[in-house]
């Protein structure tokens, strides 16, 4: 039953991506990106709906050409979650998706082209109240910066970002957020630290091309965890070569671990050893699978023996300590004993009951004003 996060977040300007606030005092938004063919409208809509069910706040969709832009418009009509169009090279694509109701444009002004083209995109965004994300990436730095620095560095990423920030500010456009991504954790972290000192715009955090499910999760947790713990970051995207739904899950798990945002069950579980009085690993796997649908933030401790079990259980909403028999704690107090027979069934029942009680209590509190 952990309280609020002790982290003091960096002050930033608030912008709106559709109905979702980003920056300022808004909760840190969790993003993902579709990996389906945008021209396959049905498949992309289905994937976005799965992401929304997982709790995503904002979804980015790649729009590589005009056919994809038209498909994007049809996709936008069929989903509720705000959509970001990922645009490179052809400014006319950005103009078209702006007409079709995009919620945010992700562009790199450096590859959109001449000043008049960038101005056209900015004017379209301003006229329709569409924010822009300046997305700088270590793998696509401008040639002059590559020549100047010899290789991607934090300073090079920040110089690129500030160049584009100044570009938008010259056009009197302030409704934007910025990212400076790299696949190297140290490079990305240092770039964000430097950039955070220079601008007030909200920052979109990510370790780009982080890797597969396991390696990408670790890289992202380390890099984003360092920044978030320092109060840097207003929205996050976990880049994984995996099902995009996993990006959302990992994103929330990172935020939960720092007490920055809660959604669903926060499990505290021991790695198990020969002292365990029930199969901890099997119990955890079953509980996680069964309770994925629960959105209510609850702390649930699953500890296999009495060494650390009582202490952890007393700090959780629901706690299980292995013993003969096993002991259940509810709100820190011993409540009932359970044998290993139907252990998971009984735990699931208690957790769902506790979640329902919390929803009812929260609703009553809101009703009282």
Swiss-Prot record:
Pfam families tied to this protein: GcpE (PF04551)
GO molecular function annotation: 4 iron, 4 sulfur cluster binding; 4-hydroxy-3-methylbut-2-en-1-yl diphosphate synthase activity (ferredoxin); 4-hydroxy-3-methylbut-2-enyl-diphosphate synthase activity (flavodoxin); iron ion binding
Reaction(s) this enzyme catalyzes, per UniProt: (2E)-4-hydroxy-3-methylbut-2-enyl diphosphate + oxidized [flavodoxin] + H2O + 2 H(+) = 2-C-methyl-D-erythritol 2,4-cyclic diphosphate + reduced [flavodoxin]
Enzyme class: oxidoreductase
Iron-sulfur in keyword set: yes
GO process terms (BP): isopentenyl diphosphate biosynthetic process, methylerythritol 4-phosphate pathway; terpenoid biosynthetic process
Cofactor detail note: Binds 1 [4Fe-4S] cluster.
UniProt binding sites for [4Fe-4S] cluster: 270, 273, 305, 312
Cofactor: [4Fe-4S] cluster
Keywords for the protein's UniProt record, in alphabetical order: 4Fe-4S, Iron, Iron-sulfur, Isoprene biosynthesis, Metal-binding, Oxidoreductase
Iron-sulfur as UniProt keyword: yes
EC code: 1.17.7.3
Pathway assignment: Isoprenoid biosynthesis; isopentenyl diphosphate biosynthesis via DXP pathway; isopentenyl diphosphate from 1-deoxy-D-xylulose 5-phosphate: step 5/6
Disulfide-linked positions: none
Functional note: Converts 2C-methyl-D-erythritol 2,4-cyclodiphosphate (ME-2,4cPP) into 1-hydroxy-2-methyl-2-(E)-butenyl 4-diphosphate.
Family to which the UniProt record says this protein belongs: Belongs to the IspG family.
Stored HAMAP family: IspG (MF_00159)
Protein name: 4-hydroxy-3-methylbut-2-en-1-yl diphosphate synthase (flavodoxin)
Native organism taxonomy: Bacteria, Pseudomonadati, Pseudomonadota, Gammaproteobacteria, Pseudomonadales
């Amino acid at each position: 039953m952990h309280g609020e996060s002790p982290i003091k977040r960096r002050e930033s300007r608030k912008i709106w991506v559709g109905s979702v606030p980003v920056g300022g005092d808004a909760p840190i938004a969790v993003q993902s990106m579709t990996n389906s063919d945008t021209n396959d409208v049905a498949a992309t809509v289905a994937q976005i709906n799965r992401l929304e069910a997982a709790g995503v706040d904002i979804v980015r969709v790649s729009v590589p050409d005009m056919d994809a832009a038209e498909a994007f418009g049809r996709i936008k009509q069929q989903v509720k979650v705000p959509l970001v169009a990922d645009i490179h090279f052809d400014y006319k694509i950005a103009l078209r998706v702006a007409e079709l109701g995009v919620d945010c444009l992700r562009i790199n002004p450096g590859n959109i082209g001449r000043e008049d083209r960038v101005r056209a995109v900015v004017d379209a965004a301003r006229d329709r109240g569409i924010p822009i994300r300046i997305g700088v990436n270590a793998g696509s730095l401008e040639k002059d910066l590559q020549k100047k620095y010899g290789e991607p560095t934090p300073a090079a990423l920040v110089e690129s970002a500030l160049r584009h920030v100044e570009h938008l500010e010259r056009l009197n456009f302030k409704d934007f957020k910025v990212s400076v991504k790299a696949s190297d954790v140290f490079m990305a972290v240092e770039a964000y630290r430097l950039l955070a000192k220079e601008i007030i715009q909200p920052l979109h955090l990510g370790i780009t091309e982080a890797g597969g499910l396991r390696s990408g999760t670790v890289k992202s947790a380390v890099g984003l965890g360092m920044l978030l713990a320092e109060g840097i970051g207003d929205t996050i995207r976990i880049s994984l070569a995996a099902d995009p739904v996993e990006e959302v899950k990992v994103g929330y798990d990172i935020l939960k671990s720092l007490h920055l945002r809660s959604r669903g069950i926060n499990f505290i579980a021991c790695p198990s050893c020969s002292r365990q009085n029930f199969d901890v690993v099997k119990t955890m796997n079953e509980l996680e699978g069964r309770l994925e649908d629960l959105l209510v933030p609850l702390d649930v401790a699953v500890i296999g023996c009495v060494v650390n079990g009582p202490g952890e259980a007393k700090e959780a909403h629901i706690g299980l300590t292995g013993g003969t028999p096993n002991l259940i704690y509810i709100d820190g107090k011993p409540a009932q004993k359970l044998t290993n027979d139907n252990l998971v069934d009984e735990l699931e029942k208690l957790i769902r009951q506790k979640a329902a009680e919390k929803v009812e209590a929260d609703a009553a509190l809101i009703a009282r004003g």
